[in-house]
């Protein structure tokens, strides 16, 4: 029966359409609901197509938009109950979905959405240092319309603008788009664009603690949020490196591995400095810079090869879209 498979369906699919009674669906999916950042969009439709109901993950999962699309296609009544939507207000998590931004903290998302529904004007502030700041500005303006203003500012400017928090009502709720670590407030929703990759090289049997320390030091130098990483990267011979894999699991990061044949042309093209020892050991003499650039599909390094105990780290800027 479907009940025996719904758990696997939740893991395998981003969108689930159930054509049956709403109550059946609620009971069936209840044990598998985790968090709005993980759950698939669930839409329910009656068997004759009169009503299409957005049940789960309306914003981040896109269930509300999917409900509208299905309803339009079959001439059904869409049923959407999220407060921002029924009041015709722009929810920041919808922009996050469209622009592939990560919600930094879900409690502040709740706080800011509540402020929007309560009639408060919520402005958007975009970090001027982002490579795609101009495009994000246009997307944010199109999203919020007349319900707020969009500002492209330096983080120094942002720090001087009051923000509402738990201890004071001074300032306003706001949405900030940045890949940098900044001060946190209860009514400041931070949306994280994916802007960089990190190439990592390490000696055989390097413990995860040394790799994690190298990662954290590199992030701290550039004030980068770990949530803005696209992927980590290394050479294929490190795909079974226990310390590296454990470090990735702790960081919650994906990692990709490149072969020496994939790396060698870029090393030559960009004239990347090679270590004779590393080249003699694995066939290429530059791991961290090369793999960071390959993963980023760019030629721009934010951090050149930096040597830490038994570990090397480089950071590349992702080509803006």
Residue ranges and their predicted role:
Residues 1, 5-15, 19-22, 26-105, ...:
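Conserved mixed alpha/beta catalytic, RNA-binding, or beta-rich assembly cores of soluble enzyme
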Residues 69-78, 108-118, 254-267, 287-296:
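Short, surface-exposed, charge-dense and proline/glycine-enriched linear segments
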Residues 171-184, 188-191, 288-321:
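C-terminal edge-of-domain segments
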Residues 217, 227-289, 296-301, 307-311:
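C-terminal non-catalytic interaction/assembly regions of soluble proteins
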């Amino acid at each position: 029966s479907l009940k025996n498979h719904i758990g696997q369906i939740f893991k395998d699919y981003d969108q689930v359409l159930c054509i049956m009674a709403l109550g059946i669906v609620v009971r069936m999916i209840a044990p598998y609901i985790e968090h709005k950042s993980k759950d698939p969009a669930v839409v329910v439709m009656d068997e004759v197509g009169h009503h299409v109901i957005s049940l789960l993950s309306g914003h981040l999962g896109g269930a509300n938009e999917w409900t509208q699309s299905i309803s339009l296609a079959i001439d059904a009544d869409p049923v959407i109950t999220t407060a921002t939507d029924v009041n015709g207000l722009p929810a920041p998590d919808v922009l996050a979905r469209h622009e592939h931004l990560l919600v930094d903290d879900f409690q502040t998302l709740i706080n800011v959405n509540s402020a929007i529904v309560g009639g408060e004007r919520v402005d958007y502030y975009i970090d001027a240092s982002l490579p795609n700041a101009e495009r994000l500005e246009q997307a944010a303006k199109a999203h919020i319309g007349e319900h707020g203003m969009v500002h492209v500012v330096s983080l120094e400017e942002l720090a001087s603008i009051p923000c509402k928090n738990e201890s004071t009502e001074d300032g306003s709720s706001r949405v900030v788009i940045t890949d940098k670590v900044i001060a946190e407030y209860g009514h400041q929703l931070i949306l994280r664009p994916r802007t960089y990759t990190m190439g990592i090289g390490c000696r055989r049997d390097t413990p995860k603690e040394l790799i994690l320390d190298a990662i954290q030091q590199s992030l701290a130098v550039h004030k980068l949020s770990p949530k803005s990483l696209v992927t980590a990267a290394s050479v294929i011979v490190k795909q079974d490196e226990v310390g590296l894999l454990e470090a990735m699991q702790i960081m919650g990061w994906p990692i990709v591995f490149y072969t020496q044949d994939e790396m060698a042309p870029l090393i030559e093209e960009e004239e990347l400095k090679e270590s004779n020892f590393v080249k003699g050991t694995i066939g290429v003499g530059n791991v961290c810079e090369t793999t960071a650039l390959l993963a980023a599909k760019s030629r721009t390094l934010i951090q050149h090869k930096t040597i830490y105990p038994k570990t090397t780290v480089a950071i590349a800027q992702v080509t803006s879209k």
